[in-house]
Amino acid sequence: RETLLAALDAAEARGPGTLQYDRGYQPPDYSKVDIHLQPGGYSGEPLAGFLYDFGLKVFMGGAADKDFVAVNAARAAGVPVDGQVHRILDLGCSAGATTTALKRQHPGAEVTGIDVSAAMLRYAHLRAIEQGVEVHFRQMPAESLHYADGHFDMVLAMLLFHELPATVGRRVVEEAFRVLRPGGTFTVL
């Protein structure tokens, strides 16, 4: 446990990519439920990212190896008709597999993953560093994005909506469209 926590701490100031979160942030109550058999959700346990990532590999029966699911999600994400992809947002990025896959699919784009769980973001950042992929991770709720209108070319939500109450899900959709530029794409998988 201490070794893993030390690795997360050491990665915080390293790159490529960046990590921003607030140690005093209180995640929304909906994130604290025992989802996927994780007691207290993925916000309360500092090693939640490790638990999620390795648990997913077991649950998916090997399909999560080499980020197979995330790579296919990145390939399936809609690209604007004009082909211009400069900024991509991954909503509810969890362990960051889809975030890094999006960067590999669109190497010239700035890719940002957001999540309410600092533990997940810290792991996602460590994972991206280990893979040498420059992506950015920010702590914020998908229903209240801290970006200007029209900022992104693409927004993706991979396996996010089953984690949210319906009222929050509607706000997430509104926010996704708000931060998309005209002609941008919003993909829900």
Where do the protein language model's features map onto the residues?
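N-terminal auxiliary segments of SAM/dcSAM-dependent transferases
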Residues: R1-S43
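Class I SAM-dependent methyltransferase Rossmann-like catalytic core
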Residues: Q38-Y42, A48-D67
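Conserved alpha-helix/loop element of class I SAM-dependent methyltransferases that forms part
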Residues: L51, A64-Q84
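Class I SAM-dependent methyltransferase SAM/SAH-binding core
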Residues: R87-L89, A95-S144
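A short acidic, Gly/Pro-enriched loop at the edge of an enzyme's catalytic core
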Residues: E143-V155
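A short SAM/SAH-binding and catalytic strip from SAM-dependent methyltransferases
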Residues: M154-T167
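A short glycine-rich, Lys/Arg-flanked "PGG" loop and its adjoining helix->strand segment in the class I
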Residues: R170-P182
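Conserved beta-strand signature within the Rossmann-like core of class I S-adenosyl-L-methionine
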Residues: G183-L189
